[in-house]
Amino acid sequence: MQDAITSVINAADVQGKYLDDSSVEKLRGYFQTGELRVRAAATIAANAATIIKESVAKSLLYSDITRPGGNMYTTRRYAACIRDLDYYLRYATYGMLAGDPSILEERVLNGLKETYNSLGVPIGATIQAILAMKEVTISLVGPDAGKEMGLYFDYICSGLG
């Protein structure tokens, strides 16, 4: 896992150079949004169960996926879906705090699509639930933090798509 600071410094170090204006500007932006990201993370942590519940209600609960024969029909499958959504929310929050999506690649997306395909998990429905989670989260954290947080939900969706 990297963060915005490490990414900028490593890029300069690999080239054996000092930070250029663009690198300094990236760091400045990261630090200027620090309080916003921390407040958003606290709001998400305090409302995680509600975010998941509303996301499921918006995207999955009344679809064919939860009816008999659907991929979320049994209690065990439903619980696994809720667990996965919580996992995506938590790691998207970590990525937002770090200002870098590498944790999503390392801990969420690496092999996930293949695993879901082998288990018959419908990726389209998963993406729909993540997009609903993005919408619910943005409504809680506000437009500025929501824009930042949305990047990480979109990253997960892109990795699954």
Swiss-Prot record:
Modification type N4-methylasparagine: residues: 71
Record organism: Pyropia haitanensis (Red seaweed)
Name listed for the protein in its UniProt record: Allophycocyanin beta chain
Keyword Thylakoid listed: yes
Homology family: Belongs to the phycobiliprotein family.
GO CC entries: chloroplast thylakoid membrane; phycobilisome
Family annotation (InterPro entries): Allophycocyanin_b, Globin-like_sf, Phycobilisome_asu/bsu, Phycobilisome_asu/bsu_sf
Subcellular location per the Swiss-Prot or TrEMBL entry: Plastid, Chloroplast thylakoid membrane
Keywords assigned: Antenna complex, Bile pigment, Chloroplast, Chromophore, Electron transport, Membrane, Methylation, Photosynthesis, Phycobilisome, Plastid, Thylakoid, Transport
Subunit-level organization: Heterodimer of an alpha and a beta chain.
Lipid bilayer topology: Peripheral membrane protein
Keyword Plastid: yes
Binding site for (2R,3E)-phycocyanobilin: 81
Function of the molecule: Light-harvesting photosynthetic bile pigment-protein from the phycobiliprotein complex. Allophycocyanin has a maximum absorption at approximately 650 nanometers.
Post-translational modification: Contains one covalently linked phycocyanobilin chromophore.
BP-aspect Gene Ontology terms: photosynthesis
